[in-house]
Amino acid sequence: METLTAISRWLEKQHVVTWCVQQEGELWCANAFYLFDTQKVAFYILTEEKTRHAQMSGPQAAVAGTVNGQPKTVALIRGVQFKGEIRRLEGEESDLARQAYNRRFPVARMLSAPVWEIRLDEIKFTDNTLGFGKKMIWLRNSGTEQA
């Protein structure tokens, strides 16, 4: 199975991302419900500009994070670690992402928070259901996939 396809299928079944940003040596992490775009390999989230993580991100910033389940045994651990870039969307790009986000999370229609894109440049997917410590790696710019 193609690495990105396997990762995308799993991410589409999850809904909470943890991401971390840094500014002047200070780190901060946050959680949010996400919409995953398989074509752009990106998460879309809503978060207010007044939050600490949004203030630290500014209009765009380097980001790293995780998506994971809550398995009861080590044999069932599956999760993603990633790095990339977070940026606030504007105009039509924001409108289109918000429409898609609202389809997945209808309650979000009540929120006015800006839409942010987390573009993934590197993904490591651990899937112990395929064997203990099984890792799949996807890199945006090299076209490299490792299983």
Curated annotation (Swiss-Prot):
Q: Locate the coiled-coil region(s) and give their ranges.
A: none
Leader sequence range is none
Q: In which domain of life is the source organism classified?
A: Bacteria
Gene3D superfamilies, sorted: Electron Transport, Fmn-binding Protein, Chain A
What does the sequence similarity comment in the record state about its family? Belongs to the UPF0306 family.
- The name of this protein is UPF0306 protein YhbP
The taxonomy runs:
Bacteria, Pseudomonadati, Pseudomonadota, Gammaproteobacteria, Enterobacterales
